[in-house]
Amino acid sequence: MASSTPSSSATSSNAGADPNTTNLRPTTYDTWCGVAHGCTRKLGLKICGFLQRTNSLEEKSRLVSAFKERQSSKNLLSCENSDRDGRFRRTETDFSNLFARDLLPAKNGEEQTVQFLLEVVDILLNYVRKTFDRSTKVLDFHHPHQLLEGMEGFNLELSDHPESLEQILVDCRDTLKYGVRTGHPRFFNQLSTGLDIIGLAGEWLTSTANTNMFTYEIAPVFVLMEQITLKKMREIVGWSSKDGDGIFSPGGAISNMYSIMAARYKFFPEVKTKGMAAVPKLVLFTSEHSHYSIKKAGAALGFGTDNVILIKCNERGKIIPADLEAKILEAKQKGYVPLYVNATAGTTVYGAFDPIQEIADICEKYNLWLHVDAAWGGGLLMSRKHRHKLSGIERANSVTWNPHKMMGVLLQCSAILVKEKGILQGCNQMCAGYLFQPDKQYDVSYDTGDKAIQCGRHVDIFKFWLMWKAKGTVGFENQINKCLELAEYLYAKIKNREEFEMVFDGEPEHTNVCFWYIPQSLRGIPDSPERREKLHRVAPKIKALMMESGTTMVGYQPQGDKANFFRMVISNPAATQSDIDFLIEEIERLGQDL
C-alpha cells in the first residue's frame, strides 16, 4: 500500500487538499483511536481497549506529553483517562442490551447513565472537531427519498417498542452525519453560520437546566441575565438606560411581529379587547427589499397583505424616502390611517441599510411608529468602524436584533427592543392567575413572561450572555470587523474578472456580496432575453454540483427581474481568506463547462 495520507491536522492547513479524501492509514495510536470511535460503540471500544493494551511504553509516553500540550477540549477526544475523575472513566459497556429505562432515574442507573452520556459527548466532540477540519465535507447530500427509505441502519420511522441504547447512539451519530455542518468554515449558505464553542457550552447547560422563562420563580438567574443583556443592547442602540423594554423571541420574524403589535397598541389600545373592527383602516409601510416577515405579520395580525404597502428602492436596495412620503400621502387621501414604517438595517439579499435618519424625519412628521429591522445588521452596532451605517437607529420606537446572525450566537437568539417601557406588558398581558400571582414573596416585576405572546419560552439568553462574558464587547467587535474585511476581500478579488459580474456597482455595505458567474459559453455575448434565460440556469446548476460534492455551500436567488445570482454572506468567524479563495476556485471548477 502507498504511504499514508496526511493526518487531518495537516490537511486542514493545506488549502489545496482534496476535501473528499479519507485518511485510510492512520500512523499513530491516537488516530487509530479516532477511527475506532467511529465504529459501532461495542466494536469501537474493543478496538480502543486493544490499542491501549498493546501500545508501547515509548508511544504511551509520547502520547501523554502530546496530550498535555493540547487544549482541554482535545484532551476529551482521547482515551487517556489517567487524570479524570474515576467516576467518569469510560468502561466497555454493552449498550445493545440496555434501554432508556436503565438510565437515571432508574435504580442503580448512575453507571449506565454516565457511560451513555460519555458516548454522546464523544460523538459531539468528534463532530465539533470535524466541523473545523476543512478536509471534512460541508454535507453528505442525499435526496429526501433516500433518507426516508433508510441509510445503513439509520431509519427515521418511529417504533412502538423501545430500541436499544446502542441504536440510539447510532441514531445520534447518523443524525449529525447526514445533516449540514453549518459551522464549517466553508458554509456560506445562510445568515446564521458558525459554531461558537462557548455558545455551545451555554446551550448544553441550558438544556440541562430545562426551565422556562415566564417567571423569576422558576428561572431566577436566567431572568436577570435577560434583563441585564437587554438593557446593554438598548444602551448600544443609543437609548436611555433607565427606560425601554424588550424580550427574546423565537426569531426575527416574531420580533418584527411584536413591533407591529406594539405600534398598534400604542395608538389604538382598544384593539386588544375589541379587535380590528374597532380601529380605522390601518396601513403599514416597508421596502420592496425588506424581509417577508412584515407581510406575514400583516396577514397574521388582521391588517391583510394588501395593506402592507411596499416602498421603492434604489439600485443598491435602499428605501427611496420620497416614495415613502408620497405613498403615505396617497394612503391618507384614500381614507387609510398610516401606522407604522419598517426600515431595514441589512437587507437579506443585498445587505443594504435604509437611510434611517431621513425615514425618522418622515415618521415624526406624520406621527408614525418607526421600527428598524436590524436582525441582520444589528451586530454592526458593536463595531466602532461600521456602526455609522445604522445612523439614526436611536430615533426608532422599536428594533429587531438577532445575535444568532452576525454575532455568531447559536440558534435561536433574537431580541425585540422597545423604546417605551410598559407597551409590551400592556399589549400582551393576560394575568394568568396560576403563573403571575401578585402576592409572591419577591418583586413580581421580574415575572416577565406576561409581556410575551408565548406562554412557555425557551431560555435563549444564557449562551449569549456567556459568549459576551467570554469575548467582551471588543471581542464581538473584532469578530464582526473580520467578517466585513473578508467580504471586502471577496469583492476585490472578483470585481474585475471576466468570469464574474457584480449585481450592483460599489463595495458591499455588509458581508453580502452578490454576483453572477459567467461561464465561458456566455462571455462576450451582449445582454438579451436569451442570454438572461441561460444565465438564470447557471447558479442553480453550480449550487446542485456543490451540494453533490459537499465541498462548500453558498446561496442564490433572483431579485426582481434579475437572473439568479449568488449571494455570498459571511458571518462565521472561522472563515479565512483561504476559504474565500477556495469558494472562487470551486465555482470556477464546477461552472467552467456549463
From Swiss-Prot:
Signal peptide: none
Phosphoprotein found in the keyword field: yes
Domain of life, per lineage: Eukaryota
Phosphoserine found at: 78
Molecular functions per Gene Ontology: glutamate decarboxylase activity; identical protein binding; pyridoxal phosphate binding
Keyword set, alphabetical order: Decarboxylase, Lyase, Neurotransmitter biosynthesis, Phosphoprotein, Pyridoxal phosphate
Enzyme Commission (EC) number: 4.1.1.15
Chain intervals for the UniProt region annotation (Disordered): 1-23
Essential cofactor(s): pyridoxal 5'-phosphate
Gene3D superfamilies linked to this entry: 3.90.1150.170, Type I PLP-dependent aspartate aminotransferase-like (Major domain)
Oligomeric form and interacting partners: Homodimer.
Name of protein: Glutamate decarboxylase 1
Lineage of the organism: Eukaryota, Metazoa, Chordata, Craniata, Vertebrata
Gene that encodes the chain: GAD1
